[in-house]
């Protein structure tokens, strides 16, 4: 077997494929590095503007001082404790209009969104009946609105409670801190009537916009000009419409679904970043780095199909190709991915794919004209390479049926190879070539006499 030309041919082709894995891995490393550079740009934009935003509120914080007694050494001792009671709204309505703009640093872009939010909350005074005990003293209440990054708070219109304009102050007003704003309620017996709050604020950020549905019944409607939303969080929108011009989504929830009534009743717990929320993220669709990385996963398939076509050509014709010629064609296929990555950063992925495919086809067409001794075979292989590039493009753009399409390509390629080689005597290729035997001489030819 070691003397078989077919064995050494297959071994050399397998070795060429293994060698080509090295530049493929290097290109994938370059893709990771370029994607990291893009992530650094997004971080820089986030640091210079504001980060993801999580809106909690409006809710009313009521300082409570409670006197209670305990038994110590056969005597009654009076104790005092202070805590914050959160008065949650019966209904919370959030209506927002979001505008997304792109910020560019070098060749990289990131997104910053600006949302104009209108908040309407109704508070039922009957929820405060538990605070009417004689041993309880109430402090001055204030409305709390918490956000993820206070740098994103823009214009805030004067909020109104029961038609009365109030003053808004920075910070949440809570001892535990937190970023946001608070609105002191006016003096008076506010416990004798229901409260209706109306306010509007401009909130900017990057990445996620989340709103905690703190009302007994909560709804949110958001309209945006960004066509690539990613709906996250604990609640998917009840309704949503996504088009090339943007999206509109509507969420709704209640305490029966999120249990926020009990979680806020825990008092001084302000770990609100873990509370369930309506969420949507402004995300970049599958960018050039993700697409190029996916494309490189099919590189071995492209190289294997090309080598298989060359091998069948050798088998059916008298033309012989050296393993170095296989390797050079394979390198040109690998360079396609590096060229695709470099071009896609400037022209977009689709245009880069077309240009890289044409450049690769021209390179191989000119080279194969000399290798295959003619333009006819060269053009045939060049068109086949362009067809394979088209198949790879189809695989990238059919995520749901990529497995089916890829399997179909392999089945068709294998069936084609089986068909064109069905009459080949492989044993003839496997046998080592025998040296031509010398002519047999007769005794009469060796004689020096007659």
UniProtKB/Swiss-Prot annotation:
Q: Superkingdom, according to UniProt?
A: Bacteria
Any Gene Ontology CC annotation? plasma membrane
Leader sequence residues:
none
* Keywords from the named record: Cell inner membrane, Cell membrane, Membrane, Transmembrane, Transmembrane helix
Any transmembrane segments, and where?
Answer: 7-27, 298-318, 323-343, 348-368, 379-399, 401-421
- Residue ranges, Periplasmic compartment? 28-297, 344-347, 400
Its annotated compartments are:
Cell inner membrane
- Tell me what else is known: Mutations of this gene leads to an enhanced transcription of the gene cause tolerance to colicin E2.
Q: What is this protein called?
A: Inner membrane protein CreD
């Amino acid at each position: 077997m070691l003397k078989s030309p077919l064995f050494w041919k297959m071994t050399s082709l397998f070795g060429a494929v293994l060698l080509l894995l090295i530049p493929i891995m290097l290109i994938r490393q370059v893709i990771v590095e370029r994607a990291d550079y893009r992530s650094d740009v997004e971080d820089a934009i986030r640091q210079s503007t504001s980060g993801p935003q999580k809106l909690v509120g409006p809710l009313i914080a009521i300082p409570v001082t409670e006197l209670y007694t305990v038994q110590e050494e056969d005597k009654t001792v009076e104790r005092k404790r202070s805590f914050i009671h959160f008065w949650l709204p019966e209904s919370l309505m959030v209506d927002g209009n979001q505008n997304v703009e792109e910020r560019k640093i070098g060749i990289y872009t990131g997104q910053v969104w600006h949302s104009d939010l209108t908040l309407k909350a109704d508070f039922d005074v009957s929820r405060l009946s538990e605070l009417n005990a004689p041993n309880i003293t109430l402090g001055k209440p204030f409305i709390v609105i918490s956000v993820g990054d206070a740098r994103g708070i823009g214009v805030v219109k004067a909020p109104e409670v029961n038609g009365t304009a109030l003053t808004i102050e920075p910070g949440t007003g809570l001892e535990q801190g937190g970023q946001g704003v608070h609105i002191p309620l006016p003096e008076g017996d506010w416990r004798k009537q229901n409260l209706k709050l109306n306010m509007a604020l401009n909130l900017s950020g990057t990445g996620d916009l989340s709103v905690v549905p703190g009302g007994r019944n909560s709804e949110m409607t958001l309209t945006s000009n960004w066509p690539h939303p990613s709906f996250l969080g604990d609640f998917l929108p009840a309704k949503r419409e996504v088009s090339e011009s943007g999206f509109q989504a509507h969420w709704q929830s209640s305490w029966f679904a999120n249990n926020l009534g009990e979680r806020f009743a825990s008092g001084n717990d302000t770990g609100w970043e873990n509370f369930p929320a309506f969420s949507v993220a402004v995300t970049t669709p599958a960018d050039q780095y993700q697409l190029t990385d996916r494309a490189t996963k099919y590189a071995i398939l492209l190289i294997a199909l090309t080598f298989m076509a060359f091998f069948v050509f050798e088998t059916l014709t008298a033309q012989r190709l050296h393993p170095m010629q296989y390797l050079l064609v394979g390198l040109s296929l690998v360079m396609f991915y590096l060229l695709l990555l470099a071009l896609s950063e400037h022209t977009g992925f689709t245009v880069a794919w077309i240009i890289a495919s044409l450049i690769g086809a021209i390179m191989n067409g000119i080279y194969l004209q000399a290798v295959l001794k003619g333009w006819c075979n060269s053009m045939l292989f060049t068109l086949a390479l362009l067809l394979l590039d088209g198949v790879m493009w189809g695989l990238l753009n059919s995520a749901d049926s990529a497995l089916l399409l890829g399997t179909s390509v392999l089945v068709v390629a294998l069936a084609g190879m089986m068909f064109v080689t069905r009459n080949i005597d492989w044993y003839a290729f496997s046998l080592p070539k025998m040296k031509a035997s010398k002519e047999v001489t007769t005794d009469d030819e060796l004689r020096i006499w007659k």
